A protein has these predicted regions:
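Positively charged N-terminal leader segments that act as targeting/secretion signals
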Residues: 1-12
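Nudix hydrolase/Nudix homology domain
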Residues: 13-24, 89, 100, 125, ...
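Conserved Nudix-box catalytic region and its N-terminal flanking loop in Nudix hydrolases
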Residues: 21-23, 58, 66-110, 157
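Acidic, metal-coordinating catalytic segment for phosphate/diphosphate chemistry
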Residues: 29-66, 72
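Active-site-adjacent beta-strand/loop module that shapes the phosphate/pyrophosphate-binding cleft
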Residues: 41-49, 132-151
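A short coil-to-beta-strand element that immediately follows conserved catalytic motifs
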Residues: 119-126
């Protein structure tokens, strides 16, 4: 065994004997910022290497909800809007915040109707996702909505939305060529593409 093979074997050995126990120790914490949607906490910690440091965490007070609508002809709907934190336009599936303590499916139904005017008779949870787990505890649920009926959209007054109906295959191409970068939408479209390729839809 040469040196490179030995290092590879050592890495695999370490991974096999790795435990999932929390190696971080919190020595103190301080609330830095709070509003109705997020809270920012700064922690004084002992990190996994045993050294002191700080860690900032953004806590989201609502869960993230995403809905990928898919009709009988395998068309889907994207929502276009300008995203303030990115300072750029974004194409996404219908998304929003689901208050804690409320059935996330009810939040998903509300978001779909508000943003697209669609109601769905068939709902399937297809993915759960942590959106930025190095700095935030934000957690999301993604639903696939089928058997669609069109009504009037009911957008919030802070939203300026463009709704685009397109073949799902085109939405998949938009993910592949980088036109769609929203993480929940990327995850949803790739998951549905996998389900289609495995004849599960």
């Amino acid at each position: 065994m040469n040196a490179s093979q030995f290092r590879g074997a050592f890495t695999i050995f370490n991974a096999m004997h790795h435990t999932e126990e929390n190696p971080w120790k919190i020595t103190s914490e301080k609330n830095i910022y709070d509003n109705p949607w997020i809270n920012v906490t700064e922690y004084q910690v002992i990190n996994p290497s045993g050294n002191p440091g700080i860690y900032g965490k953004v806590h989201f007070k609502n869960m993230a909800i995403g809905v990928l609508p898919l009709d009988d002809e395998l068309n889907t709907y994207l929502v276009g809007q300008f995203r303030f934190p990115l300072n750029q336009y974004s194409w996404e599936m219908p998304e929003g915040g689901g208050p804690q303590g409320i059935d996330p499916l009810e939040s998903a139904k509300r978001e779909l109707l508000e943003e697209t005017g669609l109601k769905a008779a068939q709902w399937t949870e297809i993915q759960q996702i942590h959106l930025s787990n190095s700095v935030s505890d934000e957690w999301g649920i993604i639903y696939l909505a089928r058997e669609l009926t069109q009504f009037e959209p009911e957008p919030e007054d802070t939203e300026q939305l463009i709704i685009k109906k397109l073949p799902f295959a085109e939405a998949y191409r938009m993910v592949c060529n980088g036109q769609i970068t929203d993480s929940m939408t990327v995850a949803a479209i790739l998951k549905v593409q996998l389900l289609i390729s495995e004849n599960q839809l």
